[in-house]
Amino acid sequence: METFYTCRNDRAFKEVFLNPNNSDLLKALLEFILKIKIDKLEIKKTELLSGNVNIKDKRVDAIVHTGNKKIEIEINSQNKDYLHTRSTAYICNIYQSNASVWDTYNEDTDIIQVNLTWGLGRNNDEMKIYKIMNEKGELYVKNFIIYEINMDYYDKIWYSKNEEEIKKNQYMIMLDLDKKELKNMPKDKIVDKYITNVTIVNNDPEFQKYMSEEEDKKKIQNSLLSEAKEEGISQGISQGYTSGI
């Protein structure tokens, strides 16, 4: 049986939400997270500085343009120590690229990063907002904003079986539900369309092939790292004996 990839997976998320035909799904999700009304959005390639393309392992993602905002979305399936450093590097690159477009430096365009992160803990806050400011809370710039969304918080709501809360938070909850769980979700046109599209993506042989190859690469990489670590430990022990330690 083929694996059903939820939108906790970066590739699956992009296939569903960055599809131009699914702009209504992306709009509904961002409106819920940012608590704003979006009249129109446009998905554009990231304007990365040429010298920093490797920052994304040579993959250029998309940025959502809406009104005076440029929004980047990061899918973090696990919470790792390096995440904040990496995410900061991404948004700083976008911030610098945006500043390079204009003849003058200004703060007219909000540069926003939305991190959908699993592994932060179900009992922690649902969201944290980060800005650049001093110890008095005075902003250094007003248009640099990072949202860190605790996706475990929404998993907790799902397993609570509180129908009212599930309905209220359904656009977040649906992102990591498997095929069987999605059938039990309260439905509206957004949820219905999401279910249809994430199913179509998972039924695509090319997508499944890509995901299988990616998982195989990760397994090989993890195996090589494990072997290197074991070899390093063995060498260290051997050198210790040789040195009389």
Where would I find each of the regions flagged by the language model?
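Generic detector of well-ordered alpha-helical segments enriched in charged/polar residues
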Residues: 10, 14-17, 26-27, 31, ...
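An acidic, glycine-/histidine-flanked metal-binding catalytic module
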Residues: 142, 147-192, 197
